[in-house]
Amino acid sequence: THHPEGKALMDLTRVMPLQETIMEALGVPINVIEKLLEPRAKKIDRALHADNFNRVADAARLLDIPFMNCHTPADNHVHKFLEKIIKEKQPKMRYLKDLTEVLLGIPEFAEGAKMSSAPVIVSGSPKSKLGKIAVTGMTGGTSGNEDIYESLSQAGVSTILAMHMSEGHREK
């Protein structure tokens, strides 16, 4: 599986510090990041402890089926890949529509678009200027704190490229 199950799911908050590294590299002060991520990690931890986290791994063991997941390494790869593409293409991109076109030029994004899962602009329009692009939400276990966007904006970030964005994150 890609998403964590069993012990890996219970250890989810151990990979959240990756979010600190990413945000700090974007110019957000570490004390601000820690203040925002700590309550989010505690919330995730509480939610996980109420879950029957080992059911899939237990079922695989009972059925004598090999089972593993590879979540963070895959997400790290996606993060680095997209950062590299953005760095290469940013001088030629000016608008959100340009970023969308670059993403759709990646075979996996093109295939996703065929299955009704194309990149979506959730704030702004295709003609909105890009500014500084931040690749976030690709790794680090789960979405970060919804209040991080103000700090990213203060660090000069104008555009967020994220894998998942909850309604609460969109509202911010």
Stretch-by-stretch model annotation:
Residues 3-159, 167-168:
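Non-catalytic interface/targeting segments
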Residues 163:
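Active-site cofactor/substrate anionic-group-binding motifs, chiefly glycine-
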Residues 170-172:
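CN hydrolase (nitrilase-like) catalytic-core segments centered on the catalytic cysteine
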